[in-house]
Amino acid sequence: MSVEKPVAAGRQNSKATGRHKGWQAKLHMQLECAITGRGMKTVMAELHHYGPLRVQRPFYPEQDTAHIYLLHPPGGVVGGDGLDISITASSQAHGLLTTPGATKFYRSAGQTAHVSQTLTVQAGGTLEWFPQENIFFPGARVQMDTRIDLHGDAHFMGWEISCLGRPVNSEVFHEGKIDARFRISRDRKPLLIERLKVDQPSHLNAASGLRNFPMQAIFVATGSNEELLEQARECIEKQATDMPCGLTLIDDILVMRVLGTRCEKIQALMLPVWQLLRQATLNKPAVIPRIWNT
């Protein structure tokens, strides 16, 4: 494994302007399938990081698949911070990435926090992306871009969960600006383009917006078909949820969208769908990351 030593970096304030310069953090990881003393398994062939972005040593609860925990900056993200994450899964590699807790975006004094997440999966590779929720505090200003680039028969499953305000404290996202994009392409052909843009209270309660729900989530899985779509709908019906939820099929991508008020309920709704599709498309039972149980 090639590791680039991190350069010291921290939040700074300009003496001349008093403005917050923020964290500027980067992380690049490449996953490859390699022969080890215990057979073939996915390893971190490359890992370079700068600033307060880290990963823990991979866990192997299912032998060949690497479970990796991505550690975000301590104390959350504020205006002026910049996070750049780039992860590549090579052919035959299979990685599952998650985070130990929610990522918090705090109130900004005027500057915007920028987050770029580029996930590349080469032909024959598999990547699963299951971070915990993003919590946008009232007054946060965030621009987030998540891009999934697939090649050939690459597989991808993942979700993104967004919470605007802090509903557990009855805090409404009454001010701030969120512009979050989620895009999937295969061989440079765009397949799915999602955008969550909130810069005024009306976006939260509009019928075409969040309908007064503080949380929204999207789950996607490649390699799907009409039969799996119907099975996924049956999974949802069995749970008898009162949360607005919809499933669609775009090419071979199953897309699930959910509105809700509690993250654990949203995750509980999506997990059976993940379990169904993982077994059907990857021929592997879903293994819950251990960190979720702590």
Swiss-Prot record:
PANTHER family linked to this entry: UREASE ACCESSORY PROTEIN D
Species per Swiss-Prot/TrEMBL record: Alcanivorax borkumensis (strain ATCC 700651 / DSM 11573 / NCIMB 13689 / SK2)
Predominant location category: cytoplasm
Disordered: annotated span: 1-22
Protein known as: Urease accessory protein UreD
Subunit details: UreD, UreF and UreG form a complex that acts as a GTP-hydrolysis-dependent molecular chaperone, activating the urease apoprotein by helping to assemble the nickel containing metallocenter of UreC. The UreE protein probably delivers the nickel.
GO MF, one annotated term: nickel cation binding
Function summary: Required for maturation of urease via the functional incorporation of the urease nickel metallocenter.
Family indicated by similarity: Belongs to the UreD family.
Cellular location(s): Cytoplasm
Keywords tagged on the record: Chaperone, Cytoplasm, Nickel insertion
Pfam family, one: UreD
One CC-aspect GO term: cytoplasm
Coiled-coil ranges per UniProt: none
